[in-house]
Design a protein with these regions (language model features):
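Long, contiguous hydrophobic alpha-helical segments, chiefly transmembrane helices and signal peptides
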Residues: 1, 53, 88, 160-164
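Hydrophobic ligand-binding cavity/cleft-lining segments
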Residues: 3-84, 91-98, 103
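Glycine-rich portal/gate segments that line the openings of hydrophobic small-molecule binding cavities
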Residues: 11-12, 41, 70-153, 157, ...
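N-proximal short alpha-helices
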Residues: 18-23, 158-162, 166
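Aromatic-acidic/polar surface patches that form glycan- and anion
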Residues: 42, 137, 182, 186
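A short acidic/glycine-rich loop-to-helix N-cap element
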Residues: 132-133, 163-185
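Soluble extramembrane regions of membrane proteins in the secretory/endomembrane system
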Residues: 159, 175-187, 191-194, 201-202
């Protein structure tokens, strides 16, 4: 069962408003940093789970209605090299995240910085290849990590964390929405890693 460190969200209609409203730019101050952590239990040992965290095959088509609104969602991940300095690419529906590895403690801790990220969502428009200014620079992912903990009966507690900066005002209001959306992205990846690992372990 996956867990998330946040309260439940308001009804569907309030969530939909996020995509109908324009983002509000904060005053020119230093963006505030936040972290979101999600956890899932995997019925496989860390040595197997690790391999599916570092890189993973293409995820199944999205079923979550939220991603069908245009929100960027993960598709696959690949890595060039091993150890600190290797470059991981996490492909999203709007483009790749470029993630240089900063911590490589196999099979328990993988951390990476983010040097490039795609747009957070695909704008609803009749025109292709449009990059609206109101999507640029308001939300930046700065780093991420996976922690794998061996627990009872050969299982693994898998924890994913994303650090991000929010340049929207009011920051703590938008944090609620941002955390919710990041958690949904986490769960898409964590559930896929769980599925792959448990199939390999059986």
């Amino acid at each position: 069962q996956a867990t998330y460190h946040a309260n439940r969200m308001p009804p569907l209609i309030l969530i939909a408003l996020l995509f109908l409203m324009g983002f509000e730019k904060a005053k020119p101050t230093k963006p505030i940093s936040f972290a979101v952590t999600s956890t899932i239990e995997v019925n496989a040992p860390p040595e197997i789970v690790w391999q599916n965290v570092v890189s993973f095959s293409e995820l199944p088509p999205v079923e979550d209605w939220l991603f069908k609104t245009g929100l960027a969602y993960p598709i696959r991940a690949k890595i060039n090299g091993t150890g600190v300095g290797a470059i991981r690419h996490c492909e999203f529906s709007t483009g790749p995240f470029v993630e240089p590895i900063t911590v490589w403690n196999e099979p328990s801790h993988l951390r990476f910085s983010v040097t490039s990220m795609p747009q957070p969502m695909q704008e609803w428009t009749f025109y292709k290849h449009i990059e609206p200014a109101h999507l640029d620079g308001y939300f930046q992912t700065t780093q991420g990590e996976f922690r794998l903990e061996s627990i009872h009966d050969g299982k693994t507690r898998l924890q994913g964390t994303t650090w991000y900066q929010n340049d929207l005002a009011p920051a703590h209001y938008w944090k609620v929405w941002s955390d919710f959306l990041i958690h949904r992205i986490h769960l898409r990846v964590l559930k896929h890693v769980k599925h792959l690992s448990e199939n390999q372990s059986n």
